[in-house]
């Protein structure tokens, strides 16, 4: 009995601790916004790459979430598919900017990152 109780406690603590590791949608959006500002103000490729890498991770994590406006919708609904597609676009744009940053092209990476704002604004209009 004691061993099974300990096992249950161990499993439940793992479940709750893993849930706390995953950032919620709002946290991911904040990470994207904060790091976009870093990209805009950066003066070297290392800063740009670091910020874009954080943005990419946040976008991929946010893609798994459901925005409040779509709560109750099926994961296969057209709206949810479009929401996730927006993150596919965003990740592609981040990858394009990251490629430029990896080549040391800071100004070009910053210019490419400007597209992120257009995507953000379009999808915020739909789902925020």
Swiss-Prot record:
Coiled coil: none annotated. GO terms for molecular function: electron transfer activity; heme binding; iron ion binding. The keyword Metal-binding applies. Residues 1-22 form the signal peptide. It is found in: Periplasm. Electron-transport protein of unknown function. This is Soluble cytochrome b562. The gene is cybC.
